[in-house]
């Protein structure tokens, strides 16, 4: 059994903010199971890797012996979370919400232990609230406090409409914490306001206020906007293994480290060691393959990951990469050769500077994988297929 301090350090990994750290540490020191709440509104039928960042954190609490509550916001989904929106969301029908709800529990159990997870829906208690209950609940918060929210404030200042029911959303989400007597609530950084409303309402109802733990929002495949099905930059956890593997391999080398930090269960010391090796010349593609294999194994199986890896290799050989090239041997005086030098000596570009320029333009690939690092070095003993543009190829071995 680990100490409360060790448990706290494990919980803290990957968290953006804990409100308040001393409160959480004190509660962990009580050595009693805490009630950990995580809510999801079933606004779409599928869970993607972005959702799993906070689900992994919930699983962490579960592994430490705490009571985890997977709350399906079937009522609040019909309101629509206004967080980050510059217009009023169209409310979903109950039929759509219930259809989406069917898949959420099954998908969540790919991460959570079903035997140790309490699943509940907030319609259970919200549907029982009467009109006077809602009026009293609304009286606990002022319009001025609501307008402290960045999204509401921007809409107010730009004279964009804010519907009254949107003000109810954070109040009802906060009331969920009262109904569940939550000790800790988890959420993305964009949910901070809503989570803090839960703290305030618990105080109002005479409960010990929950601690709040926020986790980062995972960037989508584009590396810019947060992962979202509506932006088509997502990886769904129920996608076929080959598709999941290929999507992971398509992310940039820099984004790969972000995915390792937020999605991988590997120790940070191991990830940091790989990062150092890449900075010294190791091909980041090799590290990315390990990430793809880990994620496919988690959501499918080890066998599926092996097949997906082979499918990925075969696809590039079949559709993009020639296999009948004579191998060119280039001698490294030290332990490696730089990418610019290899491209120039292999006849793929006229000068080293042209090679670096082509890398910056995204026109250089190694074994079908786009190169982004102009300082990439290939160690002695490795053989790869280099590509510039669509038609220039060379098979090179560094000796």
UniProtKB/Swiss-Prot annotation:
Q: Does the keyword Cell division apply?
A: no
Identify the residues that the record assigns to the S4 RNA-binding domain, covering every copy.
Answer: 337-398
Which UniProt keywords are given for this protein, alphabetically ordered?
Aminoacyl-tRNA synthetase, ATP-binding, Cytoplasm, Ligase, Nucleotide-binding, Protein biosynthesis, RNA-binding
**Compartments (UniProt record):** Cytoplasm
Could you mention a single GO BP entry for this protein? tRNA aminoacylation
Reactions catalysed, semicolon-separated, are: tRNA(Tyr) + L-tyrosine + ATP = L-tyrosyl-tRNA(Tyr) + AMP + diphosphate + H(+)
Q: What is its EC number?
A: 6.1.1.1
Q: Which InterPro entries match?
A: aa-tRNA-synth_I_CS (IPR001412), aa-tRNA-synth_Ic (IPR002305), Rossmann-like_a/b/a_fold (IPR014729), S4_RNA-bd (IPR002942), S4_RNA-bd_sf (IPR036986), Tyr-tRNA-ligase (IPR002307), Tyr-tRNA-ligase_bac-type (IPR024088), Tyr-tRNA-ligase_bac_2 (IPR024108)
**Binding of ATP, residues:** 229
Q: Which domain of life is it from?
A: Bacteria
Q: Which GO terms describe its cellular component?
A: cytosol
Motif 'HIGH' region, chain ranges:
42-51
Q: Which NCBIfam families match?
A: tyrS
Q: Which family does it belong to?
A: Belongs to the class-I aminoacyl-tRNA synthetase family. TyrS type 2 subfamily.
Instruction: Read off the PANTHER family from this record.
Output: TYROSINE--TRNA LIGASE, TYROSYL-TRNA SYNTHETASE
Protein name per Swiss-Prot or TrEMBL: Tyrosine--tRNA ligase
- Organism for this UniProt entry: Coxiella burnetii (strain RSA 493 / Nine Mile phase I)
User: Which gene name belongs to this protein?
Assistant: tyrS
């Amino acid at each position: 059994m680990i100490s409360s301090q060790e448990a706290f350090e494990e919980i803290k990994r990957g968290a953006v903010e804990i409100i308040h750290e001393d409160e959480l540490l004190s509660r962990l020191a009580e050595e009693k199971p805490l009630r950990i709440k995580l809510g999801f509104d079933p606004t779409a039928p599928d869970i993607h890797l972005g959702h799993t960042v906070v689900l992994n954190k919930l699983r962490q609490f579960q592994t430490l012996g705490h009571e985890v509550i997977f709350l399906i916001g079937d009522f609040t989904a019909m309101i629509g979370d206004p967080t980050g929106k510059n217009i009023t969301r169209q409310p979903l029908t109950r039929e759509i919400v219930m259809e989406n709800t069917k898949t959420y529990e099954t998908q969540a159990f790919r991460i959570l232990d079903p035997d140790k997870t309490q699943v509940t829906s907030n319609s259970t208690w919200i549907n029982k609230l009467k009109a006077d209950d809602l009026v009293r609940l609304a009286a606990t918060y002022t319009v001025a406090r609501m307008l402290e929210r960045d999204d509401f404030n921007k809409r107010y200042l730009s004279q964009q409409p804010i519907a009254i029911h949107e003000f109810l959303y954070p109040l009802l989400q906060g009331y969920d914490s009262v109904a569940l007597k939550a000790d800790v609530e988890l959420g993305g950084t964009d949910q901070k306001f809503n989570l803090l409303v839960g703290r305030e309402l618990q105080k109002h109802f005479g409960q010990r206020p929950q601690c709040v733990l926020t986790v980062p929002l995972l960037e989508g495949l584009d590396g810019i906007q947060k992962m979202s099905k509506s932006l088509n930059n997502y990886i769904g956890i129920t996608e076929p293994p080959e598709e999941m593997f290929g999507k992971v391999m398509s992310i940039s080398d820099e984004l790969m480290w972000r995915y390792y930090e937020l999605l991988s269960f590997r120790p940070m010391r191991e990830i940091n060691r790989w990062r150092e090796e890449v900075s010294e010349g190791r091909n980041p593609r090799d590290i990315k393959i390990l990430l793809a294999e880990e994620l496919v194994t988690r959501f499918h199986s080890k066998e599926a990951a092996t097949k997906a890896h082979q499918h990925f290799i075969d696809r590039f050989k079949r559709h993009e990469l020639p296999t009948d090239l004579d191998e060119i041997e280039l001698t490294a005086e030290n332990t490696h050769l730089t990418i610019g030098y290899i491209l120039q000596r292999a006849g793929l570009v006229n000068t080293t500077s042209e090679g670096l320029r082509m890398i910056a333009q995204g026109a250089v690939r190694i074994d079908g994988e786009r190169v982004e690092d102009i300082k990439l070095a290939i160690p002695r003993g490795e053989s790869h297929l280099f590509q510039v543009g669509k038609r220039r190829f060379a098979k090179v071995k560094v000796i």
